[in-house]
Regions:
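Short, low-complexity Ser/Thr-rich regulatory SLiMs
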Residues: 192-196, 253-257, 336
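Protein kinase-like catalytic core scaffold
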Residues: 201, 249, 261-265
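Peripheral (often C-terminal) accessory segments that flank ATP-dependent C-N-forming ligase machineries
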Residues: 291-374
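Active-site "cap" helix and flanking loop/linker of ATP-utilizing ligase/carboxylase catalytic domains
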Residues: 230-251, 257, 267-315
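Short, flexible active-site loops
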Residues: 213-223, 265-278
Length: 374
């Protein structure tokens, strides 16, 4: 057990590290982050920044000299870095979990071994394998890079045979994953925490709405049947247990029109769709992550109020903060990024309301207000 007063190390210094660091410091921990940018978003709230590339084991080795436990804020990290750090300090979630989740082929193979439903898919390890995969999966389909995919990057939808060659060229070739494009009713996600003792705690189910392939809104509770919500949370727990997770896991799913669920992607870290927990749950996902990786008992995951999270993007700048906060139920969280660019996540708002529908409506209004569109 890592107790307050000791140091938590975080590989990566973006907004997830920033909010994890804030939660850790509130609990009395010291925090050291590792990032290539000495002025990364987490820097102002960390005790120290180890400056180095996230694919350079030597540059990040000093993190193990000061941290009692090490975690990471995203999955596209060179596993060699964490393997080196794990020689000296516990790394949670474990390197094997990261290795599985950062490669879509390994991820889908792991899900199938656990009996978790996924969309029909085929690995494409060479250009020669692509025609057979396309024939097996059929159209429409989506072609994805096996690695380095996030926020809609590394994906191409194929609706006609003519689009197939362009898709494989656009993604710079194998290794790739070809999936059937399923006609889903909505997209859901569950953030689940699991402790070293095996205790698992799934947060309430979020219903997610994307714009430009980037998460825009997370509505909680999700507007689906209670049975679907229970099934989603059960799937998340089964995956966490099957992976031997210690820490946090974001599980993205498709909900089909008949209520069946297909798991789409995994992220072994705090998740954008879990930001609502900061203001609407008994324990935030960030505090829960720190509890789990430090070996502490997990916190309660009760939903205290219906809520809608809305991302604040670079194209919303300059911000009209006063207009957005005119609704007293809007909670603003900005990440301290120096440059606002289109489609870059700059912050988020959590909007509380008596019902999920009202929270969604207020979130849309807050989004328009902060961007100066009303």
């Amino acid at each position: 057990m890592i107790l307050p007063g000791e140091t938590v190390g975080i590989v990566g210094g973006g907004q997830l590290a920033r909010m994890s660091a804030l939660a850790a410091r509130a609990m009395g921990y010291r925090v050291v982050v590792a990032d290539p940018d000495p002025d990364c978003p987490a820097a102002p709230v960390a005790d120290r920044v180890v400056v180095g590339a996230l694919n350079d084991p030597d540059a990040l080795a000093p993190l193990a000299d000061v941290a009692s436990v090490i975690t990471y804020e995203w999955e596209n990290i060179d596993v060699r870095v964490l393997e080196r750090l794990a020689e000296k300090r516990p790394v949670q979630p474990k390197v094997d979990v990261l290795r599985t989740c950062q490669n879509r082929i390994y991820e889908k193979q792991a899900l199938e071994r656990l009996g978790i439903p996924v969309a029909p898919w085929r690995p494409v390890l060479s250009a020669e394998e692509f025609p057979a995969a396309l024939e097996a999966i059929g159209l429409p389909a989506v072609l994805k890079t096996a690695t380095m995919g996030y926020d809609g990057k590394g994906q191409a939808v194929i609706r006609t045979p003519e689009e197939a060659d362009a898709a494989i060229a656009a993604l710079a070739g194998p290794p790739l994953v070809l999936e059937r494009l399923v006609p889903f009713a909505c997209e859901l996600s569950v953030v689940v925490a699991r402790s070293a003792s095996g205790e698992a705690a799934p947060f309430p189910v979020a219903e997610n709405i994307h714009e430009h392939n980037i998460l825009a809104y997370s509505i909680v509770p999700a507007r689906v049947d209670a049975a679907v919500q229970a099934a989603a949370r059960d799937l998340a727990v089964r995956i966490a247990e099957g992976l031997g997770l210690v820490g946090l896991l974001g599980v993205e799913m498709f909900c089909l029109p008949d209520g069946r669920l297909l798991v789409n992607e995994l992220a072994p870290r705090p998740h954008n769709s879990g930001h609502y927990t900061q203001d609407a749950c008994a324990t935030s996902q960030f505090e829960q992550h720190i509890r789990a990786v430090c070996g502490l008992p997990l916190g309660a995951v009760d939903l205290l109020s219906p809520v809608c999270m809305v991302n604040v993007m670079g194209e919303d700048f300059p911000l009209n903060v006063g207009a957005a906060l005119a609704d007293p139920h809007v909670k603003l969280h900005l990440y301290g990024k120096r440059e606002a660019r289109p489609h870059r996540k700059m912050g988020h708002m959590n909007v509380l309301a008596p019902t999920a529908e009202e929270a969604f409506a207020r979130a849309r209004a807050a989004k328009a207000a902060i961007a100066g569109r009303r």
